[in-house]
Design a protein with these regions (language model features):
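Transmembrane beta-strands of outer-membrane beta-barrel pores
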Residues: 186-192, 216-220, 254-258, 328-330, ...
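Acidic/polar loop-and-plug regions of large Gram-negative outer-membrane beta-barrel proteins
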Residues: 217-222, 234-241, 245-325, 343-387, ...
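Structural signature of Gram-negative outer-membrane beta-barrels, strongest in the C-terminal barrel
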Residues: 241, 387, 406-418, 425, ...
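N-terminal Sec signal peptide and the immediately downstream disordered periplasmic leader
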Residues: 1-89, 93-99, 655
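Periplasmic plug
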Residues: 76-81, 86, 98, 108-155
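Membrane-embedded beta-barrel scaffold of Gram-negative outer-membrane proteins
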Residues: 325-327, 331-338, 342-348, 556, ...
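Outer-membrane beta-barrel translocator/receptor signature
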Residues: 144-147, 158-236, 242-247, 318, ...
């Protein structure tokens, strides 16, 4: 892949091309205002807030981060934009592939397409934040407007409220600076890869600046037939009051995506559909394959089993944010208000291996069933929906001393309103046939060859599997939608207490009142909906002790909790304690039995910051205990398994 970067100077400013250094921030953390962002001197009393070459610590963008990373008794990794750029990352998933302890799931198990990170083995899709504010919707997040990504491992409900036991992700966006600079980066590669990213910052006055990032991205998928991904986005922002005690930042983010989604290669068989093999499961059907009927052929890794004329994924994100800050004394008061609206709809083909069509089945050959194997059912997974949120956070943070003891504190409140709506599209895909692949479904292109699938098959949607009437692909009726709403009121506080230069105590406490309302879809417009409303009061806390052998090293021990109430994801993910499983009537669930899933994390570790804080080393051992653990069984019922425990060790190297 070829990458070209063209720098330029905005407004005919004279001087060298400027880029924002790692950890740079444009606003001060506390009065008197710091001016490191615009190049002036910083006094000695403020140097504890500085990481690199007199530049402000990026923790200023997350008020709850009351200590530098080396003094934080948690396993925390920060990816600056330099690392994101140098690794060629274009999405959140790309960027996090470089971080140990994080894997990504796909749209399996009923999850919608979108980012699904697993941190320390726990699904953390509901614990993603942008500038410290929850970003719940299922989506594939871009990085063109990202300045850094912060990963906190371990139980984290003290930081963000309801959340997973594994940890959380916080995306820090680019913001205006008192400077003139800009760049255009163009990338080209195989599979018709084309990407252009622009970043322009204009200093409007000695206290105001405007910044805008833009994206255009178009590519096929290397090594896969027919697939493509296209998207564009823009992210303008303006700040007034830079370098003064009072600052206002208004920002907007828009991303539009269009893609032909891919769900991969089918498995050959499972125990349920391959009797006599003695195998519980097998690997993907790739390479030379022999079916139960004796047919031998070659399955190429590039095979795409979907339909180019049917499958699609369209998504848009609109996000508007207003942030106001004021410094007084050694404290900063900040209010952040954000409105977010996300839309997503898709049809993607799951190359289904559950019906015995791939390997073959002993099912009775009735109705023209193809039982000898060598076929793939093009199961259509469909979804449309949107999510909205309006969240307001108020934070007071800063430093002060009580005698010989120094405090770095953050206290705040959060009020959130969230809702999601989701339904399905009316698509005929042969679901009524068993086994799925028959002469009829093959003739209608709802099944295809395992060895030679054709994405350009002339598939047509019919009113039903038995109808010959052509029908448009439309949304199913609104009364069939699943509806979720939530309200949250929170209060929290953090204190990093420097007892001595070598000993630091870190404390945090949070209370959340989380009310959720869930309503399943119904069969007719006249059928009344069943409404489930519940309120959970969640108390979470954390405590840690840090010992510093040297200023650049630390050894720590910590304890933290997390709480995941039912319906925590509002249907934007597949939950083992979701109030509504799939689309069935929630009245079939005993609401009182859905207890809050609670976790406790114990962690010990050591950190070192080397070479002028350009290289960070971390080693941590952890144990996570889960109470009220549960899973979804094969019959789509919630099964309680009591307690669960996970232990692990992590080693990380992070630098620039």
């Amino acid at each position: 892949m070829t990458v070209s970067t063209v720098p330029f100077l905005a407004l005919s400013a004279v001087g060298a091309f400027a880029t924002a250094p790692a950890w740079a921030a444009d606003e001060p953390r506390a009065a008197p205002p710091m001016s490191g962002a615009d190049g002036s001197d910083v006094d000695d009393a403020q140097r504890s807030d500085i990481l690199v070459n007199g530049v402000r610590d990026k923790r200023a963008d997350v008020a709850k981060a009351v200590a530098p990373l080396v003094n934080t008794p948690r396993s925390v990794v920060v990816l600056p934009k330099e690392v994101i750029d140098q690794t060629g990352s274009t999405t959140l998933e790309d960027a996090l592939r470089t971080v140990p302890g994080i894997t990504f799931g796909a749209a399996e198990g009923g999850n919608p397409i979108g980012d699904r990170p697993f941190i320390r083995g726990f699904d953390s899709q509901g614990s993603i934040y942008v500038d410290g504010v929850r970003d719940l919707a299922s989506q594939t997040r871009e990085v063109f407007a990202t300045d850094s990504i912060q990963i906190v491992r371990g139980s984290d409900s003290t930081l963000g409220g309801r959340g997973s036991a594994g940890g959380s992700l916080n995306i820090v966006t680019k913001k205006p600076e008192l400077d003139n600079f800009g760049s255009v980066q163009a990338s080209f590669g195989n599979a018709d890869y084309k990407r252009v990213v622009a970043d322009v910052n204009l200093q409007l006055s000695d206290m105001a600046a405007f910044r805008v990032e833009g994206l255009w991205h178009d590519q096929d998928i290397a090594g896969r037939d027919a697939l493509y991904s296209r998207r564009w986005g823009v992210a303008p922002s303006v700040t007034i009051g830079l370098g003064t005690p009072t600052r206002l930042t208004a920002s907007y983010y828009y991303l539009e995506s269009h893609a032909l989604p891919d769900s991969g290669i089918p498995y050959l068989y499972t125990l349920g559909n391959a009797p006599g093999t003695g195998e519980v499961h097998t690997g993907p059907a790739i390479g030379t394959v022999t079916t139960a009927g004796g047919q031998t052929g070659f399955v190429d890794r590039s095979n795409f089993y979907g339909l180019a004329s049917r499958d699609f994924r369209d998504a848009t994100t609109n996000q508007a944010q207003l942030r106001v800050e004021h410094d007084f004394g050694g404290l900063t008061l900040r209010n952040t208000a954000r409105y977010t609206h996300n839309d997503q709809s898709y049809i993607f083909t799951l190359p289904d291996d559950s019906q015995g069509n791939v390997y073959g089945t002993t099912a009775t050959n009735s109705g023209g069933a193809l039982t000898s194997g060598g076929y793939v059912w093009r199961r259509a997974n469909t979804r449309y929906g949107y999510s909205e949120s309006l969240i307001d956070q108020t934070d007071l943070f800063g430093t002060f001393s009580t005698g010989s003891i120094d405090h770095s504190i953050a206290v705040g409140t959060e009020f959130a309103w969230e809702k999601s709506r989701r339904g399905t599209l009316n698509v005929s895909s042969g679901f009524g046939n068993s086994p799925r692949c028959t002469t009829a479904t093959l003739a209608r292109d709802n099944c295809t060859s395992l060895f030679t699938p054709n994405p350009a098959d002339p598939w047509v949607n019919y009113a039903s599997d038995t109808s010959s009437v052509v029908a448009p692909i439309v949304r199913n009726p609104g009364f069939a939608e699943i509806q979720n709403d939530a309200r949250t009121q929170s209060v929290y506080g953090f204190d990093s207490i420097t007892l001595t230069p070598r000993l630091i105590l870190n404390l945090g406490l949070r209370f959340d009142r989380f009310t959720s309302i869930a309503q399943a879809g119904v069969a007719t417009a006249d059928t009344p909906r069943t409404r489930i409303e519940r309120t959970d009061n969640l108390v979470n806390w954390q405590a840690g002790l840090v010992f510093k052998p040297t200023p650049e090293t630390s050894v720590y021990a910590s304890y933290a909790t997390a709480a995941t109430p039912p319906n925590a994801l509002l249907g934007e993910g597949r939950e083992d304690n979701n109030t509504i499983i799939g689309g069935r009537d929630p009245a079939t669930l005993t609401v009182d039995s859905l207890k809050v899933q609670k976790t406790r994390s114990y962690e010990v570790g050591a950190k070192a910051s080397l070479f002028g804080e350009r290289l960070s080393l971390g080693l941590a051992g952890f144990q996570t205990d889960i109470r009220n653990a549960r899973v979804i069984d094969a019959n789509q019922n919630v099964s309680f398994i009591g307690e669960n425990r996970i232990r692990g060790v992590e080693f990380s190297v992070n630098g620039q």
